[in-house]
C-alpha cells in the first residue's frame, strides 16, 4: 500500500539512508526463492526500523514474525553490545535461510531464533524488552499485546506492522474476516490504554509506534 505518488515515493527512498548490501542480497534471494516475498519490510521501512532501534539503543528486543530475517537485521543495528534479539516464527523451513544471513551480519551471536507458537514461546523468555516488533498473524495481535505488556517497562516501545491492512480498517467489515476484525480491536486497544501513548504512521501498510508511559 502506498500513500504517496510513485515519483514522490522514489524521492523519499532516494533521500533516505541507502539499503545495506547484505539486506539487498537478502531481499534479492527472498524474491527469487521464497513464497510471498511481499512480506519483506523493504528498503524504506527497514531504514525506519533501524533508525528507531538506534535511537532507543535497546538491550533486549523481541520480534514476533521473522520471515526471512530482513526486519530482524534492521532492528539489531541499534542493539547494545551485550544485548539480545529474540525472533519468533512458525516456519521452520526458513530457519537455515535466516541463520545464514544473521551470521553474515556480525550480529549472529546476538540473534536468537525460536520456532513455534509465539504465544507459547514468549512466556519462556525471561527478559524485560526495550523494543518489540509485531509482524505476524493478524488474528493474534490483541493476544500478543496482552502477553508482552507485563514484559515491558516505562519507555519500552512496541512497533506494529500492517495496522492499516491495505485500507480494510476503514471499510465495512466483511463477515468472517477475522484478520481485519482483530486489527480493529488491536488498534483500539493500544489507543485507549491509559498506560500507552501511540502514533500511527502511514508507512507502507501502516506502522504503529507505541510507548509505555
Model feature map: region roles:
Residues 1-131, 138-159, 163-213:
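A short alpha-helical cap/connector motif
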